[in-house]
Curated annotation (Swiss-Prot):
Residues 79-113, 171-217 are annotated as: Disordered. The lineage of its organism: Viruses, Varidnaviria, Bamfordvirae, Preplasmiviricota, Tectiliviricetes. GO terms for cellular component: host cell nucleolus; host cell nucleoplasm. Keywords: Host nucleus, Late protein. It comes from Human adenovirus C serotype 5. Residues 202-217 have a biased composition (Polar residues). Its main location: host cell. This is U exon protein. Induction: Expressed abundantly in the late phase of the viral replicative cycle. Coiled coil: none annotated. The keyword Flavoprotein does not apply.
Amino acid sequence: MKIVGADGQEQEETDIPFRLWRKFAARRKLQYQSWEEGKEVLLNKLDRNLLTDFKAFAARFSSRPRPSKIFGTSLSEAISGEGNGQSGRGAARNHPRARTRCGATSPNHGGRVVPVPVAAASPGAPKKADEAAYRVRGRGRLITRRAGAAHTQPAAIDLGGGFGHCAQEEKEAPFSQARAPAITRGNRGQRGRKRRCGATNGGFQQPTGANQAWQRR
């Protein structure tokens, strides 16, 4: 691009694209004329200080991230450097001090176990990365589940004072041990006879001890 003064004596050639000149001129509110699609620019007065400022403006723009239509970054934000060269949402999300908030948005979750935000502990207290706190909705107790354990070991803490104890740890038995032992085919008939009070003759109970002696009389 070639910048020429009104008198034609002063001129400056640069490799800066014309679109940056338009942004610079709009910010400075400069009046100019251009020919050949911006290859030549005519100013009323060509000032060396103005050219220096224009080169510095172009250098600042080229060093910052370019505007992205995907993230919605405006050209003014990219030029000024606001938001780290990103849109408002992206800058807030990728800010080094930004903290994500996890937890349920609805107060009622049908009794499901949902993660809730836990208050930050004091700097002196160590944080356990392998433990996550969950709250059971509608039951008023806090359950701590340890990730990586072979079996879930919930520690129930009474939040409403209804259990009468501070904490209780119980280990859930495997599903294979919790099932009742299988009944073989031969034991099924024996159990059936026991339910019928040991009947052997047509479902009637045999007389025992004193009843047999009384019948002999």
